Amino acid sequence: MQESIACGKTVLGKQFIGVVAALAFSSGMCAQTAPPQQPEPAKSQKAAPAPRRDLSGIWDVANTMEGISPQGVKSHAPFTAWGADIANNVYKPGDGPRRVLIGRVNDPLDSCDPAGFPRNLLFELRPFQVVQTPNQVLMLYQYQRVWRVIWTDGRELPKDPDPRWYGYSIGRWADDYTFLVETVGLDERTWLDNAGDPHSSELRVEERYVRVDHDTVELTVKIDDPKAYTDPWLARDKLHLMLQPAKTDILEMICAPTEAEAYKKAIADPATK
């Protein structure tokens, strides 16, 4: 029987309806039940030197649970009044310090909305592939089977971009081993993480990828959103990514609307009664 991955759960064809009656469809449960893919250990004690200006390949987080981050970011800057109102009164997460009962959760992921950026870096960061072209860097993610385009042709960020789920990104090499990415134009409907931490349309995200050696990259993600937070802060700080063998098969982790509806009828709706 063909096996697929749906929202982080292993689903065997029509057996899903029975499974969903026993397992919560919430994003937190998806994170906990997804089959872990442990990065393969390096074949040698000392990795080869890093290639210059090259992130090509398939990468995975060295510590799987650190990549999944089911309870949200470890810490963040204080909320502004606007950010606190959204976090405490509007968003109803199923995980983290402000989690609510399952029948009250309004996480967009439970309706199969896109995770968006940077949530796809802060929750369920699974294997992803980097493809470099002369004018772009493409990042292809396992979770929700989505991709990002990072322009490297020297263009500037747009001044007033239309909001996008994954924003508008430009990148450049700060040196031979450090790739910097800036992203703006992010849709306010997305959450930052599983804990329902919000962001506004003023959000600016900076990513720093440092190629330490042939097999290792350190990822740092900086959040700068003056409407939602009092100060810029680091959502990821030197997260270790490991290069995977070229034969690695990136799985499907797709949220199917039919499965989300089945979960809603079997679990979420009865929980509100």
Protein language model features and the residues they cover:
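A general, composition-driven signal for non-globular sequence regions
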Residues: G8-K9, S26, A47
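N-terminal secretory signal peptides that target proteins for export/translocation
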Residues: M1-G13
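PEST-like low-complexity, intrinsically disordered acidic/proline/serine-rich tracts
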Residues: Q2-E3, G18, C30-K273
